[in-house]
Amino acid sequence: MGEVRTVERSSAGSAALELLVHGVGGATPEKMLNDPRTVRITGDETAAVHRRAEDADADAPAADATTTVRDHGGRPVPEAYVWSNLTSGNGTRALWLLLLPFMVVNLAHWMRPAAREGTRAVRLYGLLVRLAGLSLTVLLVAAACEVALDLTAWQCAGTHACAARHSWLGFLSPTLSHGGWWSPPGRRLALAALVPTALTGLLWYLSHRTWRAYESQEPLDRDPEPRNGPAHTALSRPGFWYGRRLVARLRAGHTAAGLLTVAAAVGTAAAREDHRPGGPPVLDALGRLLEVSLAAGALAVVWAVCRRGRSEHRLDRRLDAQLVHRLPLTALVLLTLTLVYAAWERPGWQSSGRLPGDATFGGIALAQGTLVIALTVVAHLLHKGPDGEPAPRRDSHDTAAPPQTHGSGDPLAPDRHHRTPPAPDTLVDVLGVAIALPAETPTETAALPSPRLSPGETGESDAHPETPSAARGTGVGPAKAGARPGPPGSGEAGGEGMAWSAQDETGERGAGAEPRTGLRSPGDGGGGSAGRAGAGGPGGARAALRGLGGPAVAMLGCALGGVMSGGVSQRVSDWLDGTGTFLDGPPVLLTWQASVIPVLLLVLLALVGLLGRRTWLLTRAERVAVAREYDADPGDPARTGRIARARSMATLTDRGPLVVAVTSTTTLLLGAGALVGAFGTGKTPVRAAQGAGPFVQGAAQAGQALGSWLIGLGFLLFVTWGRRAYKDASARRTIGILWDVGTFWPRAAHPFAPPCYAERAVPDLTWRMSTWTRATGGRLVISGHSQGSALAAAAAWQLRPSERRRVALLTYGSPIERLYGRWFPAHFGPAALVALHRDVDCWRNLYRLTDPIGGPVRLSGDDCGPEVDHAPLADPLAYGRTEEHPLPAPILGHSDYQADPAFAEERGRLLARLHPEVPVRHA
């Protein structure tokens, strides 16, 4: 046996790997590797790593016994990690649409403001979101009970005309079956209870199956990093992507809640009959005992959901076995006893009106509104911080902004690039910007400056080689002291450090009318300071809605659950009672909730008009900027308009906080009004408006009619979309894009939410990078597009610090800061991104102004070293026909970043910068 020593080898003979991770919508390995012949190296049909066929043996032992791997002349071996089947998969994934409210409320858990871990406010925030998720489970099962028990078994089967209209209900009708065995109300309810029970069982099965496939994928087992340290982020914890214990616990609690909801719907109807004067004493006592048992079961469910949150600081392989098995089993036993109790013979019992328990939906709506308000208070306190003062906010007028540079390196003249107000979050901010912005206001602002270092700066700290330098992650300059020198400005080594200039990136490129420096960064209404690391302060000033994104999204999830519940109830009621004369219909509250939908649509229509006006004004201003950048004066007006329109439309993503704020606030207010109207009058809006003025009566009639029609139409469209996605792969991929964003996060608030694909993808990438770097000692670039960049960053965080320093990160079209940094500030906020920037060997980010998803990472300044962001890429590459582009260049937006020459340049610089130490075996 020979000993293994570590010696330095030049980059020309080092093992190098380029790991490609695709984004939303998926991709094939053939397209990612640009080769029709690919082979699967590791993985399965769901997610796998592929290589070109010619590179299949790149990791095989070399013929020379002195080296551990074959020498490929320094050429990086490209690998493609394909994970699209994790979200699009087979046709059954289309059924995940039914779980959309659960997914939305689960997102709210991860949207909390940045705060110190372990505080009571942080724990309270998670507890409130879990309770909101529990209320959605109860709401969904209650809606199934409303359809099966109330509308079908209680009302329709108990009405001769309705049962005669639907012959399949004849055996349940007391008149049509001539008093058959199933005709008593209790037995009808017991039989109909099988429908919501089966729904609960289906949800349990889907959650259990996906739990075994996703949450049970073990990440790398390693020591946790210090809590609340300067480089601390929850994404670096060993157990972050291993939620096996919590999901099992929540699944037990939510399953029991669903079964107890069914038992309560059946048992309360029978108990009310037994509690009347002259009722059978034995059944009366059993009914009261059953009610106490159901209340105790409900308390046990709430305790199980609230008692424990996530355990992320270690791989928690334990399971609460007794709770996981006994709680649902106990609830099932109670449900069985309730069905037997309800089916007992009760002479003279007849069904009339609506099923008792009509107030259930009102109680759920009240509880959800209270939880959202409490969540808002907690989120506001977390965002303000412990001192009670809001985090400092820097905007585009901050005098500390770094100097902006043109392609020539000179400061931009004030009359060439102007600034606009920072991207607004609140309704007042956006109204002011949209209304006050004149048509002639230039919207072009300085691009992020191209990174430079003074001669002699290396971007590395020689005095403390083990400490990640503030200059690491530049993507250029030497990686190690004594690296091979390069020519001045090459960015490869020597004393020039980070030496390529803005002229190399975005300067004038000849007669092709290609653009000069770009515009403002997406999501940034202002200049450079808004993009500097730490611009948000500890509280994150760029956090969406001032840290209230979580409560707003939780409100939307509850509203979506209400719309789905009301929609299915309304459609089934209309189907059973075609003339509207047989049945009392669904609960009054559901009718009120449907009646306020037209008002919500009017508000959203006004908001769309406001955003449309702003986009139109911005497009006019962008036309001037486009003509100046491409030297296209006069140019082609249609071509200029398309480019300007693409840029202005891309900024609509940054208006997302406004849309969410207006929608959630309006929904909360209208929901409160519907609750007051339903409980205050006990009548539908039309009946409640009788005797009022003609205008009020007309508004009530229009609202109720339109609301009923709209909610039914929405339900039909929802089912149609799901059915189409079940059969059509392209539609399934479209739904997969929704899941790409919504199911990135683990299931922390709702076990019935669609599974978190990152709990499979992140361990896959982490294991691949860790094992490869340890086996070869080589260099590695992980390249992520769109959502793949979030996976790449999450995987890098999961590496050991020593392995993290051997990894370079290339992101393009990345939503890491533009979406994740704003909506999830506790996990992708400035502090977390700065820590990642310092830990990895180098990081470069590419984006376009026409990209509605990707944007800058905004890391620059003295606190984190030189910038990560490349200046905005030109899109299109050329305005007209040129030698390099004889045909009109397309506007690429979010796709085909590899088509830009800057991509190959940045990729080459990252690979050249990594100079690893490779283990060499000596006899």
For the regions a language model picked out, list residue spans one by one.
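Long, intrinsically disordered, low-complexity tracts enriched in Ser/Thr with interspersed Pro
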Residues: 400-425, 436-525, 529
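Active-site signature of alpha/beta-hydrolase-fold catalytic machinery across serine-
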Residues: 794-798
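Conserved acidic catalytic loop of the alpha/beta-hydrolase fold
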Residues: 766-776
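Short coil/turn segments at beta-strand junctions that form active-site/ligand-binding loops
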Residues: 776-779, 805
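Lipolytic serine-hydrolase domain surface
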Residues: 728-763, 814-923
